[in-house]
Amino acid sequence: MHFLLATATLVASCNAFALPWDKRATDPSLPALPLEHFNTPKFARLLTLDQALSGQNASVTTIKPEDLPDAKSQTPTLVIPKNITLENITGAVEHAVDSLLEKRDTCSNVRVRVEWDSSSDNDKQGYINAIKCLMNKPPSGQFPVSKSRYDDLVGLHQTLTPNVHGNAKFLLWHRYYTWTFESMLRDECGLTGPLLWFDETRYAGNFAASSIFSSRWMGSINVGGNCVTDGQFANLALPYGPGSSNTPHCLARNNDDSKTINTGNSIVDACNSRSDYADMAACAEGGAHAWGHNGIGAVMSDVYASPGDPVFFLHHGFIDRNFRIWQNNGGNARLGYVDGTDSQGHALSLDMTVNVYGFRPDVRIRDILDTRGSTLCYKYNY
């Protein structure tokens, strides 16, 4: 009987143990890059609360129109493995999407994304272990710079940055990108607990007070642009960025409370008061989204390669949750409607494709508007 109890206790607590690192993932010898190196081209301007309240938005890119083609030309090219052709990718994606929609007309088991403070220690550790698992796995070969499967996600974001920032596709693409991340954690690394998100309104102006940024979990934020040397991502090696260049460096942060103060309820509510999708999305991008990135700073302030900091996905869970609240406030009408344009000036439509370069099947915008629909099948705990 004592043996059975001891075994049950061990099984119940096993998720509390941190996953060990593969040698690829960390490198204490890598330097922190000067902060000015992370001041890469931005595709949307920062919005103050007053600007958000007055109806302004961030749709005006900080890149001059004449410089945009040059910015795009510097973005790395996707490398497709030799055993895959564009023709069979298209066919496979079409078949996969059709099959998915046929087999899952309804979402019968909605997953709940849980806010960090509401999650158990076992769920926190399980989530971090799954991320470290991706960082330990070898890359797919799609992106030559990648050292791990997690790096592939960073390479994907870097490659598509000019297409999915500074336009109305921003919230939609990042919704599917974050879902792709979750799907990889579950399918490739066995995550069984919830995907976590960070309610930044609770720590606006004081991110360091969140246990996320502690030596127990994701490491310190008040490191003045230097390498994060504590927590479970200490000495993390990053091959991507800054910008569209790739200079190996460490995970660095540079907390700025004068910026994170702008992730509070006031600016979230101001953006969510907009009635048009594209107007709300532009406000959200330059509002809490941009202030959160720049407030954490260093790696997170680099638009292209910011997913190199694992906090990226906690942050984008927050942004997606705010988007979902805007949808909820408009009833079913906002689950079947978009407006605005993409990076090429094409009007968004419900049948426009959202792609993640084969990481997961291409979807249509209509497939991902309802997070509780058959494609995504998730909701937030509040």
Predicted features by range, described:
Residues 17-382:
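C-terminal accessory segments of proteins
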